Regions:
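Non-catalytic interaction modules of co-chaperones and other macromolecular assembly/maintenance factors
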Residues: 1-177
Length: 177
């Protein structure tokens, strides 16, 4: 080539930056790769451009934990809510949703919200589940009224235990008489 282009030096390729819009589907996970056809480097000798591969880095949430297509969150409740049950509004991927906490729930029990997890990439109409893990939080600072109520509850529960234990002992004594 006698008269080489001063921009490309006769190669037909000029280095530069280009903004490419990439559609990211719901449900992608960290380190997922998306291929964008013919948006990569220019081909050699006038050939077609290569493909652009975008590697996704998904930021972790402070509230949700993801395992596959299921998401987990924690729900702190009071001992009274655990004993009596309650209706509580929780945060989900789609906004707020009311769930029912059954009476007698224990720390570590979970409540499943079916279909409220992350969409499956191959089947976007289907989703994983949202699992709400219950944590019963014992109060550390009590008002005088709360302290008195807890004392009364303590006495009631201890009397019930003492009654149960004495009835068991009476049965054992009856066997030996």
């Amino acid at each position: 080539i006698k008269n080489k282009c001063h921009k490309c030096g006769g190669s037909g390729v000029v280095k530069g930056d280009e903004v490419v819009e990439v559609k990211i589907p719901a449900g992608v996970d960290n380190m997922s790769k998306i291929r964008v056809s013919r948006e990569g480097d220019a081909g050699t000798n006038g050939g077609p451009a290569g493909d652009l591969y975008v590697v996704l880095h998904v930021k972790a949430s402070d509230y949700f934990k993801r395992e596959g297509n299921d998401v987990y969150s924690r729900l702190d409740i009071t001992p009274a809510q655990a004993a009596l049950g309650d209706e509580i509004v929780v945060r989900t991927l789609d906004g707020e949703q009311k769930i029912t906490v059954q009476a007698g729930v224990q720390s570590g029990n979970s409540i499943k919200i079916k279909g409220a997890g992350v969409p499956y990439i191959q089947r976007p109409s289907q989703r994983g589940d949202h699992i709400v893990v219950v944590a019963v939080k014992t109060p550390t600072k009590l008002t005088e009224e709360e302290r008195n109520l807890y004392k009364k509850l303590y006495e009631i529960q201890n009397n019930k235990k003492a009654t149960q234990q004495s009835s068991i002992m009476d049965k054992v004594k009856g066997v030996f008489q």
